[in-house]
Amino acid sequence: MKTTSFILALIISISIGKAQTNHQVSYFSLQDVKLLSSPFLQAQQTDLHYILALDPDRLSAPFLREAGLTPKAPSYTNWENTGLDGHIGGHYLSALSMMYAATGDTAIYHRLNYMLNELHRAQQAVGTGFIGGTPGSLQLWKEIKAGDIRAGGFSLNGKWVPLYNICLLY
């Protein structure tokens, strides 16, 4: 009986494994998905309206300021002016990119290009290819390059998560 049970379990295991190996994950683009009238479409439209309600000049302000340029508008408050400056701008780029890919909305496309152009202005002003919104980030990276590295739980050389801030842009 034990032998029969073992053989049966083995056959079932092999069969399941064989069946599963024939399936492959296939990727698709967001533009290949169209939402029908549903709570999902409603949520997407709510997101779209929120994204367009944000001021790109306020979101690009930390990057322009750190590049020595005069921002067109003041930064948003809270995290955008207390040491984590620029991180919402990084999230905003992702939101714009994904919303454009999902909807093809031209207002989103123009907003994305505007943000990228403002970041390009900041990058050109710095002259090294760097873009950053963290206050004092240019000095921070000079310190790192010189080997002066003071890492903390959420900080690097006294700056609040500058690597996180960079990864949001790239």
Predicted features and spans:
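Bacterial Sec-dependent N-terminal signal peptides
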Residues: M1-T21
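Low-complexity, Ser/Thr/Pro/Gly-enriched N-terminal "stalk/linker" regions
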Residues: Q20-I88, H110-A151
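Aromatic-residue-lined binding/catalytic grooves and analogous aromatic/hydrophobic interfacial grooves
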Residues: Y92
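Aromatic-lined, polymer-binding surfaces characteristic
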Residues: P162-C167
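Conserved small/polar residues in nucleotide/adenosyl-binding loops
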Residues: Y170
